[in-house]
UniProtKB/Swiss-Prot annotation:
Gene3D superfamilies for the chain: Ribonuclease Z/Hydroxyacylglutathione hydrolase-like
Similarity field: Belongs to the metallo-beta-lactamase superfamily.
Superkingdom of this protein's organism: Archaea
CDD domains documented for this protein: DHPS-like_MBL-fold
Matching SMART domains: Lactamase_B
PANTHER family (alphabetical): 7,8-DIHYDROPTERIN-6-METHYL-4-(BETA-D-RIBOFURANOSYL)-AMINOBENZENE-5'-PHOSPHATE SYNTHASE, METALLO-BETA-LACTAMASE SUPERFAMILY PROTEIN
Entry protein name: Uncharacterized protein MJ0448
GO terms assigned for molecular function: transferase activity
Organism: Methanocaldococcus jannaschii (strain ATCC 43067 / DSM 2661 / JAL-1 / JCM 10045 / NBRC 100440)
Amino acid sequence: MIKILVDNTAYKKFFAQHGFSALIEINNKRILFDAGQNSITLRENLRLFNEKEGFDYIVLSHGHYDHCDGLKYVIENDLINGKVIAHKDAFLDKYAGNRYIGIDEEIKEYLLKKADLEIIEEPYKIDKDIIVSGYVPREYEYEMEEFQCIKDGKRVKDEVNDDMFLIAKGILITGCSHSGIINVVEYGKKLSEIKGVLGGFHLVGVSDNYLNRIVDYFKSQDFWIMPMHCTGFKALTKLSQLNNFVYGHVGKIIGI
């Protein structure tokens, strides 16, 4: 099953937060996909789910604070029981304008020096039913927010090449889809059958033309969608009119 631990909206007593995290329990494995932006929200939502055990794998969709900084709770409570899977660019210093949006430096140092870190660029199979995408090819046009990062001592445009997703028994879980949600899904189809797509679609502030293209794309698909996090209210409103739309929030449990 998949449990939504962090999202911008929450059900009943659960806590909402700008960010994303999901717990995937499959084939006797516990996989934490992202960790939200701080310890408090992750801790409290795990408590409300009555989740006390550690994680066999941690997968980072990309190196932004709202997906990684909740790892402080995981590290401090010794809940990492296995590999941490990430792209090398997740550890770059990242900015939105003058605002630092990368991974907290203490967390970054721990992951790089003490964790069993698996750096990937190509698809990585955890087992026969679980695959992490690695780098997502950008074959279809998409609109992207302007980010910067530090490379070789210089501040340059960040293409967010560390953007990755995970597929568990046909359910595609994406953190922010900085590669473009159509690119994410179409690449996912090359790796696995797709039965559903959930997570951040990153459609805040996009043009009407692009948003309409996304809506038409999902209207033509035969799997369910659960847009969350950075999808945005306007896009959620339009996507919610589709027959394959499912509402997602913290506290949601999805069977797989």
